[in-house]
Amino acid sequence: MEALVYTFLLXSTLGIIFFAIFFREPPKVPDRGGK
């Protein structure tokens, strides 16, 4: 059970940090620009 809790907390933290950085810095790749 401890492993599950630690994994969940780690994923949540990484997700929050990723979204924070993503929203702070707008993506340079256009959404509908293809490659």
Curated annotation (Swiss-Prot):
Record localization: Plastid, Chloroplast thylakoid membrane
Membrane-protein topology: Single-pass membrane protein
InterPro entries: PSII_PsbT (IPR001743), PSII_PsbT_sf (IPR037268)
Any one Pfam family match given in the protein's UniProt record, by short name: PsbT
Broad class of where this protein is predominantly found: plastid
Taxonomic superkingdom: Eukaryota
Keywords tagged on the record: Chloroplast, Membrane, Photosynthesis, Photosystem II, Plastid, Thylakoid, Transmembrane, Transmembrane helix
Membrane spanning stretches: 3-23
One GO CC annotation: chloroplast thylakoid membrane
GO biological process: photosynthesis
HAMAP family: PSII_PsbT
Its job: Found at the monomer-monomer interface of the photosystem II (PS II) dimer, plays a role in assembly and dimerization of PSII. PSII is a light-driven water plastoquinone oxidoreductase, using light energy to abstract electrons from H(2)O, generating a proton gradient subsequently used for ATP formation.
Complexes and interactors: PSII is composed of 1 copy each of membrane proteins PsbA, PsbB, PsbC, PsbD, PsbE, PsbF, PsbH, PsbI, PsbJ, PsbK, PsbL, PsbM, PsbT, PsbY, PsbZ, Psb30/Ycf12, at least 3 peripheral proteins of the oxygen-evolving complex and a large number of cofactors. It forms dimeric complexes.
Family: Belongs to the PsbT family.
Protein name: Photosystem II reaction center protein T
Organism encoding this protein: Cunninghamia lanceolata
Gene: psbT
